[in-house]
Amino acid sequence: MLWFKNVMIYRLNRPIELSVEQIEQQLSAFAFTPCGSQDMAKSGWVPPMGAKSDALTHSIPGHVLLCLRKEEKILPSSVVKQELEGKISKLENDQSRKLRKTDKDALKDELLHQLMPRAFSRFGQTLLWLDLANDLVLVDAGSARKAEDCLAMLRKSIGSLPVVPLTMEKPIEMTLTEWVRSGEPAAGFAIQDEAELKVLLEEGGILRCKKQDLSSDEIAVHIEAGKLVTKLALDWRERVQFLLGDDGTVKRLKFSDTLREQNDDIDREDFAARFDADFLLMTGELTGLIAELIAGLGGEAPRQG
């Protein structure tokens, strides 16, 4: 299966009251269909197991995996600009007058309509994991905007999705700064060699460190001068490495070779069995990581609702 590369974590304010079968049924009304000749973009659900299954959900007890596909039509701006300039020039010569902005805008709309069937498509897929056992929704996305787009589609599909970003009681940057300053992260975590330090005042300085000893005097001087650690590379129990942001995002997930090879005894020809085992393994590891991360960061902020 496709292991998550990033995790945007959201807290469900109340449990999803649907069974896996009901989720499957409601997603089917929003299954992916390709763009028509005049569509700029379309999104819809596809089987997480790809061509190996028709099911729009893949589940193990307490956990459901979904996959959202998006198709975007791409028209190179240079092509549009060149063709539009040619049409504007011809019309202005024919009519012996300069076109107004409204005329140019109308001409551009007409041109886009004509060019759309010739546009090429860009496809993307995003995995979503419903952790029903812990009332979390996790999205394999590198940006909040991409994650929110996926959540909006899920909300539209199942009728309701009361989620908020997972939030800590204490500002994460304060905790990360203390970890680096003291050299003592929470139990189970080890500081790696990458960080971002920032002065939180407007137009404050930013220091990005890679392959650097974060326990050095140089880093200590920056912290003493008021910079806070806003991103920090961490290792969790020598099993998972990641970059934690002050907004709670977990990026650049890297699962250890030992972990990923754990299911190598399963015949790769048995795709479904291997997919199932990998999903079980990944959810188990990330559930443990997230639980220890929440505790290590001082606990979650009180839930609303």
Swiss-Prot record:
<dbReference type="InterPro" id="IPR007476">
    <property type="entry name" value="RdgC"/>
</dbReference>
<keyword id="KW-0233">DNA recombination</keyword>
<dbReference type="GO" id="GO:0000018">
    <property type="term" value="P:regulation of DNA recombination"/>
</dbReference>
<comment type="similarity">
    <text>Belongs to the RdgC family.</text>
</comment>
<dbReference type="GO" id="GO:0043590">
    <property type="term" value="C:bacterial nucleoid"/>
</dbReference>
<dbReference type="GO" id="GO:0006310">
    <property type="term" value="P:DNA recombination"/>
</dbReference>
<keyword id="KW-0963">Cytoplasm</keyword>
<protein>
    <recommendedName>
        <fullName>Recombination-associated protein RdgC</fullName>
    </recommendedName>
</protein>
<dbReference type="GO" id="GO:0003690">
    <property type="term" value="F:double-stranded DNA binding"/>
</dbReference>
<dbReference type="Pfam" id="PF04381">
    <property type="entry name" value="RdgC"/>
</dbReference>
<comment type="function">
    <text>May be involved in recombination.</text>
</comment>
<dbReference type="GO" id="GO:0005737">
    <property type="term" value="C:cytoplasm"/>
</dbReference>
